[in-house]
Amino acid sequence: MQRIWISGYRGYELGTFGDKDPKITVIKYAIKQCLTNLLEEGQLDWVITGANLGVEQWSAEVALELRQDYNLRLAVMLPYLDFGSRWSENNQLKLQNLKNQADFWSATSKEPYQGGRQFREYQQFMFQHTDRALLVYDPEYPGKSKYDYEMIEKYLEKRDDYQLDLVDYYDLEQAARDYEENQREW
């Protein structure tokens, strides 16, 4: 069984506005290309992601779309029980819909938010329950995913059976060109 942890920038870190922002289309296109390649090679069974607004929710949406054509499952993991409870009503509804559509969802801490320890335990869980990670993240432009990136890099020094794939800004620019070219062909 092959499992991938997907994370990356939050929507506000990328300056996205609304669900129809062209940046979101390009990011989802890039994620879809990565996942499709793994699926075609028989190297992916589960997408395991968080529920942060941004790359994590967009990757879950891509996984749900790919699930229609591939034997792919989606797990949404939360770092604590009441994750998202302070979000706007619309964003809480998005989270609930995502949890309803996932094959599995749970929280790594069964308690409400208490502090940074819950995020470290979440990272540890995600790392231990996946075989590789895909981060839409560029170390030259730090964001909240910096902590996931640094933790994975640290563990890669000890584990050679884990793989980290980065989709950085250069990759996103290339994905935008590819997407635009594919749209012209249609």
Swiss-Prot record:
It holds the Pfam family YpsA. Transmembrane segments: none annotated. InterPro entries: YspA. NCBIfam families: PRK13660.1. Belongs to the UPF0398 family. PANTHER family: UPF0398 PROTEIN SPR0331, UPF0398 PROTEIN YPSA. This is UPF0398 protein Ldb1014. It comes from Lactobacillus delbrueckii subsp. bulgaricus (strain ATCC 11842 / DSM 20081 / BCRC 10696 / JCM 1002 / NBRC 13953 / NCIMB 11778 / NCTC 12712 / WDCM 00102 / Lb 14). The lineage of its organism: Bacteria, Bacillati, Bacillota, Bacilli, Lactobacillales.
